[in-house]
């Protein structure tokens, strides 16, 4: 689908469709008022007859409106004007895209960017419209033999900005929005892949393809089990030893700043391509969804794709920690004591708390990069789902400024996160009689004690942890990966690169 921006009055648009908003109760937006005036009150007369109230989700498609060059006008209900917020704006865009796609409008000029969203500028409105449009049109049909597509799908969308001075900002918004949307799509595609296809080797192949596509400044290295053994990554290796699939750690290095002083930001993604729970096996109900336990790695891959596409002037390293947790004669057991790469020992009390055992060695490994900051992304705990539900990602950090940056980026992007504490009192729950620590701390504060566990391996750099167990995928009829938190991390890196969208 093609996107562009222009600045012009509605009566001069010669398009298949013009899209404008209507507020409750039957109040036309400024552009809709212009069209009504041009058409000698044709639109307002329809509203007076009760054709459209302006409630959220309502639509009215008009054909051959008098004195209007475009074939059709699509009126979209936007609710009460004062109540229009970021969430409702995205819902309006989503409804617009679905309606245009379903009614055979192959191109449209969208004036919804005129809507006032408190605290948001035209860059934000255009970018969010692009991201929302791509999200709305996404379908996971790679493995379907019959792919259903509309007969006349939406091909082109033009966003109108109020002045010519804002065209540059609008074009940048489209560029950023498309790159972020492509990163989200890549993360979703990986997340939705079945575990018999998407194993650690598949993740590695995707990482190598990324380097091939952006060979100018992207390098990928894949570290296998023998190298991990030599590095002392015994905790990581233990998790995968029950599987027939080799554990592989893919390291994607993007260099956008050649300065010797430019330290990288490191993103670490948990990549459990299937988590059966191991010997502490999970219930069979819903176990198919454990293919999503690699959504952290999928998100990191999506972000690295966005960074390379936009050629951001910063250095970023993405690590995809690929592994599979299976029961078997060689599987690790409850009661085992593992020696991590850091030298610290861990008593395994539950083999289903495996993500932290993989991440702890990766967090030690990335010390060699002397990072500016490290952010790990993981579907880590069911406790985070209990605490925050499926709407907000859990955030923990050992560095307040980094946490504040991530929270700000989450608010900017709409991919929200909430900070949880990392107090020393929680560390006591990880005590073990037989090792330096246990791999679980009991049910109370389970998301926090998991973060506390990871914090013991991050003392040499600024670090944040994103627990996406509640936000990485949806269940039920809308089942599928969400691509979160690609948008959050993309905004964080755009801010670091100086593109905060506040021009």
Swiss-Prot record:
Known EC number: 3.4.11.1, 3.4.11.10
Keyword Manganese: yes
NAD listed as a keyword: no
Enzyme superclass (EC): hydrolase
Amino acids binding Mn(2+) 1: 275, 352, 354
Chemical reaction(s) catalysed: Release of an N-terminal amino acid, Xaa-|-Yaa-, in which Xaa is preferably Leu, but may be other amino acids including Pro although not Arg or Lys, and Yaa may be Pro. Amino acid amides and methyl esters are also readily hydrolyzed, but rates on arylamides are exceedingly low; Release of an N-terminal amino acid, preferentially leucine, but not glutamic or aspartic acids
Essential cofactor(s): Mn(2+)
Binding residues for Mn(2+) 2: 270, 275, 293, 354
Active site: 282, 356
Locations listed in the record: Cytoplasm
GO BP annotations listed: proteolysis
UniProt signal peptide: none
Keywords on record: Aminopeptidase, Cytoplasm, Hydrolase, Manganese, Metal-binding, Protease
Cofactor binding remark: Binds 2 manganese ions per subunit.
One Pfam family per UniProt: Peptidase_M17
Chief location bin: cytoplasm
Annotated GO CC locations: cytoplasm
GO molecular function: manganese ion binding; metalloaminopeptidase activity
Family: Belongs to the peptidase M17 family.
Function: Presumably involved in the processing and regular turnover of intracellular proteins. Catalyzes the removal of unsubstituted N-terminal amino acids from various peptides.
Name assigned to this protein: Probable cytosol aminopeptidase
Organism (species): Escherichia fergusonii (strain ATCC 35469 / DSM 13698 / CCUG 18766 / IAM 14443 / JCM 21226 / LMG 7866 / NBRC 102419 / NCTC 12128 / CDC 0568-73)
